Amino acid sequence: MSPNPSQQSSAVAFHPSAAPITLPESATWPLADVLALFELPFNDLMFQAQQTHRAHFPKGDVELATLLSIKTGGCEEDCSYCPQAARYDTGVEAQKILELEQVLDAAREARASGATRFCMGAAWRSPKERDLEKVEAMVRGVKQLGLETCATLGMLEEGQADRLKQAGLDYYNHNLDSAPEFYSNVISTREYQDRLDTLGRVRQAGLKICCGGIVGMGESRQQRAGLIAQLANLNPYPESVPVNHLVQVEGTPLYGIEPLDPIEFVRTIAVARITMPKARVRLSAGRRQMGDAVQAMCFLAGANSIFYGDKLLTTGNPEAGDDLALLAKLGLKTHASTLTEAQKERCGG
């Protein structure tokens, strides 16, 4: 018998927890209200999510975003899900940051295949000065190709977000990963407040925010609701919300954990859509293990963005041709196909 999705057990060791992070009394989406959405009958939840989706995205298009690892492995953090953490034996070797032309070649390929957003990710705690200068050059180069630019570089210090904005960055990705009350199960080398502080610096610099989390790490339904509540109550909530399904990698502490029920993942997408109606809700890691039927339900629930390309940082992803075939089967258009020529020219702006 499969486990009750609302009571998924955790196989992760507990770390000492920091001061609790709580929602303000004036929260737009109190935890109880978000949890109530999760507990709706499935058809009722899907109906409400689809109504919300159609009201805010009448074209019904799906954004294709490509993610490139510009610096792989050797990270000093201890994220329990991550094969790039240096302390875990996962077969991922540390590599130096890519050269500018390597990044631009990948961006050109992404643009040619239909992607409209290009995200650059680095496995480190935070960027050093020499790294930031290289990333700034990458951002400028990708921007000149007419792509929306996104970067995920870990925690940012004062002034770093402003520099990225000046270089032409559109979005900064910095996920919350989980609900605050589950966070100590996942990582001990960074506090939840550190993540919130970085998001504050990003927003203050005038950048758009890409922020989501990971489900299927052993959290309960209430803790999944807690993650969505944290995201929905950011003021304003993120423009992009990547929802990752845990990809279990041998050698990481989360390897072998009980998988999340697929219907519970679809519920998470639907609740994200209802609580953050104008956001691009992105199907991120874990799509290869879902199959077409679960992904189709996710699109019905309000997902309207995917990471596109055969690799996400270090883990596998569906082939680009398979993604395009699935979208065609479902009658879904890509975001690029709905843009006018003028919009395409200023896509990166």
UniProtKB/Swiss-Prot annotation:
| Pathway stated in the Swiss-Prot or TrEMBL entry | Cofactor biosynthesis; biotin biosynthesis; biotin from 7,8-diaminononanoate: step 2/2
PANTHER family on file:
BIOTIN SYNTHASE, BIOTIN SYNTHASE, MITOCHONDRIAL
The protein's GO terms of the molecular function aspect are: 2 iron, 2 sulfur cluster binding; 4 iron, 4 sulfur cluster binding; biotin synthase activity; iron ion binding
Tell me, in a sentence or two, what this protein's role is.
Answer: Catalyzes the conversion of dethiobiotin (DTB) to biotin by the insertion of a sulfur atom into dethiobiotin via a radical-based mechanism.
For whether the record's keyword set contains 4Fe-4S, the answer is yes
Q: What is the official name of this protein in its record? A: Biotin synthase
- One Pfam family of this protein, by short name? BATS
How is the cofactor bound, as the UniProt entry phrases it?
Binds 1 [4Fe-4S] cluster. The cluster is coordinated with 3 cysteines and an exchangeable S-adenosyl-L-methionine. Binds 1 [2Fe-2S] cluster. The cluster is coordinated with 3 cysteines and 1 arginine.
Q: Which CDD domains match?
A: Radical_SAM
Give the enzyme's EC designation.
2.8.1.6
